[in-house]
Amino acid sequence: MILNRLSTLGIITFGMLSFAANSAQPDIKFASKEYGVTIGESRIIYPLDAAGVMVSVKNTQDYPVLIQSRIYDENKEKESEDPFVVTPPLFRLDAKQQNSLRIAQAGGVFPRDKESLKWLCVKGIPPKDEDIWVDDATNKQKFNPDKDVGVFVQFAINNCIKLLVRPNELKGTPIQFAENLSWKVDGGKLIAENPSPFYMNIGELTFGGKSIPSHYIPPKSTWAFDLPKGLAGARNVSWRIINDQGGLDRLYSKNVTL
């Protein structure tokens, strides 16, 4: 499973430098580093049956990293069984450099009447002393902790963005259907219904003036948002969706069905 860490997805690995267990250790020095890469887009709209799309990745570190890219299913718990190919799947990216990934559909069956959701996850793998792909001692020194560090914790950040597979049969964009969301309160939850064929990616959501953690609403489906306490009698819900470019659309507001 990919662990959720703040606004990105992270995989945590631990490395301990050796020290004598039976010797006196008045102080154990701890150190930690995060290793991540940036993706040039906040989401990818993949036209179904397209030959492929390109997305850029950048190494923000001051030493080289290995870039590993994978496609995961909607719940992000396993690699997608649908035939998407990312090339190159694994490569070295030097310090402060940028490169491109190509994502291509290689078959598979997708619904033609609504979008499908996958995730592109890109991870920067830091070098270790024994790695032969790091041929520069200076780069290794930049990565490795001081010799007096007793415990060294590594955070290899797995940065994921939505890969929205959009059939050519769909007309329009999500923002043209955003106001059609319907809302009701049931069992202490705020239920949103999305009748459109598009994923509605909620960027901002308030109910009774209080902010609600946002989430996407699948096409032709519903999503239940947990409500905080103290909202008895509240009726007004306001929301903004995230558009195809990653920006917030206009504000919509309705009274819920009780």
Curated annotation (Swiss-Prot):
InterPro entries: Ig-like_fold (IPR013783), PapD-like_sf (IPR008962), Periplasmic_pilus_chap (IPR050643), Pili_assmbl_chap_C_dom_sf (IPR036316), Pili_assmbl_chaperone_bac (IPR001829), Pili_assmbl_chaperone_C (IPR016148), Pili_assmbl_chaperone_CS (IPR018046), Pili_assmbl_chaperone_N (IPR016147). It holds the Pfam family PapD_N. Residues 1-20 form the signal peptide. GO terms for molecular function: protein folding chaperone. GO terms for cellular component: outer membrane-bounded periplasmic space. GO terms for biological process: cell wall organization; chaperone-mediated protein folding. Coiled coil: none annotated. It comes from the Bacteria. It is found in: Periplasm. The keyword Chaperone applies. Keywords: Chaperone, Disulfide bond, Immunoglobulin domain, Periplasm, Plasmid, Signal. PROSITE patterns: PILI_CHAPERONE. Disulfide bonds join 121-160. Has a stimulatory role for the envelope antigen F1 secretion. It seems to interact with the subunit polypeptide and to prevent it from digestion by a protease. Belongs to the periplasmic pilus chaperone family. This is Chaperone protein caf1M.
